[in-house]
Amino acid sequence: MILDFKQIEETVMPNFKGGEKEMAAKMYADEKTRIMLNRLVPGATVGLHTHEGSSEIIYILEGNGKVLYNGEEMRIEKGQVHYCPEGHEHSLINDTDADLVFFAVVPQQ
């Protein structure tokens, strides 16, 4: 299967997971996995949440920002991956003046 994100419509989600501002996403989902190309606008956040029944892999394609992971804050930049296993909490923060673009995969347990 080939997923062509150029052909998938972008959906804008205000206050995603209780976060600030908005995240735009191009998504594919089936019963086992969600695959997303996401964009956090400057100043936007993905709200702090715990993964129950899934994990998440985030690969930064453009920009940089911060990850909150189990109470620890760390910087993340283009080319790096953040992994949040099931049962752990995290948030992604774009604290810059440029879009933060990332690829995310959420396999369902």
Annotate each predicted stretch with a short phrase.
Residues 86-109:
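Ligand-binding loop in jelly-roll beta-barrel domains
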Residues 1-32:
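A short, N-terminal "cap"/entry segment at the start of jelly-roll beta-barrel domains
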